[in-house]
């Protein structure tokens, strides 16, 4: 009962002990378990480097509301409010490029649409990361320890496609360790084999993000978002004259018409 002061003080004391041990940030599991105002109180008291909540919901507005709710704890700075895992972006990407390995009557439970139009939200990015003022609070991901066994799980060549998106776009991207290191992992009777992993592809994408300065505030101009093709230009910031990255995902061909000196 987080309305109980004894419980509140106990949580704050525990977080203080974790910081003393060297922990820098908090990941809140099952963030729907109690009101976000209490997360705000705990964050304000402990001042982590970063905080992210697992509010498992594919609706970007509901994720925004949860983040906003953490302000109600009396937090005065946006640097201390909690972020949230961007399940809205996760499910949007999954529906585009993932065909389920789970079937019912021989039919996959989810079929990839290969239509990227849902990544264009009236000219802006889709998902929580595309909401004005929330990109620095949107922790984008391709899979995690729960989703990797679900029907929406990314497998095979779909994995680098998804990272090509989140690692070149605004948000706070994170990498699922099995995708990076490879190997077999089992949960709930489901086993996924990631072979030798995708470290080479992921390292290249992380290097691009770092060297070009792409960040949560970077500017995205979507050139194409349609069946078979997603293409966008990324500027380090909206005030920059030229894009630093051109991204193309999907089977259809596309050539950048903006910028010069592109390296594939």
Model-derived regions, located:
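Glycine-rich phosphate-binding "P-loop"
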Residues: 1-11, 16
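Active-site-proximal helices and loops of the catalytic beta/alpha 8
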Residues: 12-264
């Amino acid at each position: 009962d987080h309305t109980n002061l004894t419980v509140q003080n106990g949580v704050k004391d525990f977080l203080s002990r974790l910081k003393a041990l060297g922990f820098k940030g908090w990941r809140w599991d099952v963030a729907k378990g109690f009101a976000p105002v209490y997360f705000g109180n705990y964050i304000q008291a402990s001042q982590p480097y970063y905080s992210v909540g697992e509010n498992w919901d594919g609706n970007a507005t509901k994720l925004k509301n949860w983040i906003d709710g953490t302000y109600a704890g009396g937090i005065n700075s946006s640097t201390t409010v909690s972020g949230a895992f961007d399940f809205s972006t996760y499910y949007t990407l999954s529906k585009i490029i993932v065909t389920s390995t789970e079937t019912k009557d021989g039919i996959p439970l989810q079929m990839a649409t290969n239509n990227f139009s849902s990544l264009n939200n009236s000219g802006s990015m889709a998902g929580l990361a595309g909401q004005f003022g929330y990109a620095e609070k949107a922790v984008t991901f391709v899979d995690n320890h729960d989703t990797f066994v679900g029907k929406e799980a990314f497998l095979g060549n779909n994995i680098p496609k998804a990272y090509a998106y989140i690692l070149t776009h605004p948000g706070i991207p994170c990498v699922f360790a099995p995708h990076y290191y490879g190997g077999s992992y089992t949960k709930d009777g489901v086993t996924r084999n990631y072979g030798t992993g995708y470290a080479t592809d992921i390292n290249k994408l992380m290097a691009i993000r770092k060297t070009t300065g792409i960040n949560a505030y970077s500017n995205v101009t979507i050139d194409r978002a349609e069946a078979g093709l997603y293409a966008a230009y990324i500027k380090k910031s909206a005030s920059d004259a030229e894009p630093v990255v051109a991204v193309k995902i999907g089977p259809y061909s596309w050539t950048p018409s903006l910028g010069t000196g592109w390296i594939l």
